């Protein structure tokens, strides 16, 4: 799944000399949590999160009056609070790669740049969640079950043969390999004839491996 299929392309960005006051307003007006900072050529030079804005803003306990606070927010620039040289991804990178980068670096979004380093989009944890929902077929309903099978070539074939026998339409298949030499297969299907057909299917799956759960 390439990032380009899931990223936001209509990206709100700012220049390095944009005031903190304007950055905060843009976040509020567009309901976003991060804004890339770009130079005159459109290349990404930084990123600002809503936390950066909060940390740089005067606290409620400040002794500054309203005019002093407004002056401070107007004078503080994006370049003063941004994270410089942020981690970026390419449109051709996968969503899985982007998710791993976000997880490992504890960030909620990544600018997407082309080969010249110019901003072409942004992908967030929210976009990753949407991709996951689509991959798993969660919106399509049906029956989902998980089965534990040996992590060996050919062990999944009897399962697919069984699904074919019951005329089950496969919506998604995900696998996770465990350290104990087994793998968990998460399968979502639909178009089974009735409840009895579902019960017969799960009984057959249980003969192939250990059924971990089954639910609609």
PLM region descriptions:
Residues 206-216:
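Short, charged, intrinsically disordered terminal tails
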């Amino acid at each position: 799944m390439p990032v380009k299929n899931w990223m936001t392309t209509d990206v709100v960005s700012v220049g390095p000399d944009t005031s903190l006051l304007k950055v905060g307003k843009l976040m509020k007006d567009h309901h976003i949590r991060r804004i890339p900072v770009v130079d005159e050529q459109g290349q990404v030079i930084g990123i600002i999160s809503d936390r950066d804005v909060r940390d740089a803003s005067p606290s409620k306990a400040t002794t500054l009056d309203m005019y002093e606070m407004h002056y401070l927010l107007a004078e503080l620039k994006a370049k003063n609070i941004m994270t410089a040289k942020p981690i970026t991804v390419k449109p051709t990178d996968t969503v899985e790669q982007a998710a791993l980068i976000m997880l490992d670096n504890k960030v909620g979004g990544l600018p997407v740049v082309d080969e010249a380093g110019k901003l072409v989009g942004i992908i967030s944890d929210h976009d990753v969640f949407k991709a996951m929902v689509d991959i798993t077929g969660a919106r399509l309903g049906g029956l989902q079950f998980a089965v534990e099978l040996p992590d060996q070539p050919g062990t999944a074939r009897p399962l697919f043969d069984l699904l074919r026998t019951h005329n089950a339409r496969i919506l998604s298949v995900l696998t996770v390999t465990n350290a104990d030499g087994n793998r968990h297969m998460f399968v979502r299907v639909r178009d089974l004839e009735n409840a009895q057909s579902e019960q017969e299917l799960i009984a057959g799956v249980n003969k192939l491996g250990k059924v971990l759960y089954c639910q609609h």
